[in-house]
């Protein structure tokens, strides 16, 4: 039997899982990977440590499965988008990798907004412009760390770097690099004019060739094989942006379905075969894992990470939290929570807060407000996406909160949409493994027997949630005015 390895390098963990061509998972190992934040707004990773953890997780996955490495026919990597993982001219890590959640370029991005730069980029890139984009990080380095900037040999994103460690080959993968603001989505190529507009003249020469998600990028080297336990010569494909991987596993194949991801980030995505030139809102487009298709998505770091922070502060377990929230009448409390601990989707520099607390409120009310606030923030994206996809009547939901029945029911009641929850445990790993199957011409039948959990909205609570959502919007508008 042939097997396929999918690795997911996310915001908190690196996970590796081994699958057969039906998508059956035989083993999965995950390990926490540190985010270094030595200054306000910084979010970095030690690149050498990242590679060591990556290699260790692969080795442990193979050992746990008891599968012979020779039977692993392909490898794919899914990872966070954007950020910048730089190599010097000798292909050594050039400082730490900078993550998409890094905000050191905030002042620079505000200046670009004042100058109308995003509006000039958008017709060519179909991207917005924010602090985690490679271009923002690169321009910040050019201004604040010019010696490091001058030493750049190659610009990669995290899965490009890890693929390089496995194969020794340098590429930028299409689903990720198409959202860099250096890639012209109409021509399908890097565009020097975009770099010039951003004050990054000459930087295109530092970008490796673009490779498709399911294209073989190289083969496992002897050095990498020794560390990982993989067989020398195992094929490694381009891999993909984790948002694309999740959409793929959610079965998005037309414009009647949307995918909502509740994880470190709130993400809403849809898939289309064309770029709608008539839309006035700046929808974000990127290349999809299927040729000729685009992913359209909205995202912000305003999701379940907010709850995780409170869990750590209060030393709570999730079963206890769900019981607390389920004990309250839906949308009945005056307490609002703005889930901006890690960033905002309502304005640059906005921060988290509770509002509307009174003496009779309990911990349960605060927890309920966190659940609601995460969904209210998600709704900001969902409302915009439903303008782009007006035929969408079904929401497929993935991410950690899908394990919480009360949270799912809240989402259905609030949106009024029918929910489907794909019963796939590791969407990042499976999507990456699927690209590996395609790369080696395996006839995969991963989704033929996929089961779904269904959640129907309760219309009795729709009006109450909508009223509270209006208060949430008024609060974020007022907070934005204070900046």
UniProtKB/Swiss-Prot annotation:
Against Pfam families, the record matches this protein to: FGGY_C, FGGY_N
Keywords in alphabetical order: ATP-binding, Kinase, Nucleotide-binding, Transferase
Work out whether the entry's keyword set contains Kinase. Answer: yes
**Catalysed reactions, semicolon-separated:** L-xylulose + ATP = L-xylulose 5-phosphate + ADP + H(+)
By its UniProt entry, which Gene3D superfamilies does this protein fall under?
3.30.420.40
**Claim: ATP-binding is one of the keywords in the record:** yes
GO molecular function of the protein, one example? L-xylulokinase activity
Which InterPro entries does this UniProt record tie to the protein?
A: ATPase_NBD, Carb_kinase_FGGY, Carb_kinase_FGGY_CS, FGGY_C, FGGY_Carb_Kinase, FGGY_N
- Quote the EC number: 2.7.1.53
Q: What family name appears in the similarity comment? A: Belongs to the FGGY kinase family.
Q: How does it assemble?
A: Homodimer.
Give the protein's recorded name: Probable L-xylulose kinase
């Amino acid at each position: 039997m042939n097997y396929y390895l999918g690795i997911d390098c996310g915001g908190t963990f690196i996970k590796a899982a081994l699958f057969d061509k039906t998508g059956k998972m035989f083993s999965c190992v995950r390990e926490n990977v540190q985010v270094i934040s030595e200054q306000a707004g910084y979010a970095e990773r030690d690149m050498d440590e990242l590679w060591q953890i990556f290699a260790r997780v692969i080795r442990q996955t193979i050992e746990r499965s008891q599968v012979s490495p020779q039977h692993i026919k392909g490898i794919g990597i899914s990872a966070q988008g954007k950020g910048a993982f730089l190599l010097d001219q000798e292909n050594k890590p050039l400082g730490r990798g900078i993550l998409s959640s890094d905000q050191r370029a905030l002042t620079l991005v505000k200046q670009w907004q004042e100058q109308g730069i995003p509006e000039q980029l958008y017709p060519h890139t179909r991207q917005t412009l924010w602090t985690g984009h490679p271009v923002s990080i690169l321009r910040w380095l050019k201004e604040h760390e010019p010696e490091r900037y001058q030493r750049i040999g190659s610009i990669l994103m995290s899965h490009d770097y890890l693929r390089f460690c496995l194969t020794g080959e340098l590429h930028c993968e299409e689903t990720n690099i198409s959202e860099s603001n250096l890639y012209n989505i109409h021509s399908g190529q890097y565009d020097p004019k975009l770099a010039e507009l951003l004050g990054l003249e000459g930087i295109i020469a530092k970008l490796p060739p673009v490779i498709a998600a399911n294209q073989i990028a190289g083969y496992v080297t002897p050095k990498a094989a020794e560390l990982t336990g993989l067989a020398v010569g195992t094929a490694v494909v381009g891999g993909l942006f984790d948002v694309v991987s999740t959409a793929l596993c959610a079965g998005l194949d037309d414009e009647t379905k949307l995918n909502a991801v509740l994880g470190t980030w709130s993400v809403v995505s849809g898939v289309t075969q064309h770029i709608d030139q008539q839309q006035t809102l700046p929808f974000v487009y990127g290349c999809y894992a299927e040729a000729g298709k685009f992913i359209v998505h909205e995202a912000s770091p305003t999701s379940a990470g907010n709850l995780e922070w409170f869990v750590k502060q209060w030393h709570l377990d999730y079963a206890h939290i769900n019981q607390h929230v389920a004990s309250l009448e839906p949308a009945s409390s005056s307490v609002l929570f703005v889930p901006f601990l890690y960033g905002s989707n309502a304005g640059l520099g906005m921060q988290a807060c509770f509002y509307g607390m009174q003496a009779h409120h309990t911990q349960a009310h605060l927890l309920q407000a966190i659940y609601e606030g995460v969904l209210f923030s998600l709704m900001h994206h969902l409302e915009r996406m439903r303008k782009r996809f007006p035929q969408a009547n079904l929401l497929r939901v993935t991410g950690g909160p899908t394990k919480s029945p009360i949270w799912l029911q809240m989402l259905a009641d609030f949106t009024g949409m029918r929910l489907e929850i794909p019963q796939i445990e590791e969407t990042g790993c499976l999507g990456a493994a699927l690209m590996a199957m395609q790369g080696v011409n395996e006839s995969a039948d991963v989704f033929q027997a996929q089961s779904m959990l269904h959640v129907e909205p309760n219309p009795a609570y729709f009006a109450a949630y909508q009223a509270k959502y209006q208060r949430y919007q008024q609060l974020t508008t007022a907070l934005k005015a204070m900046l």
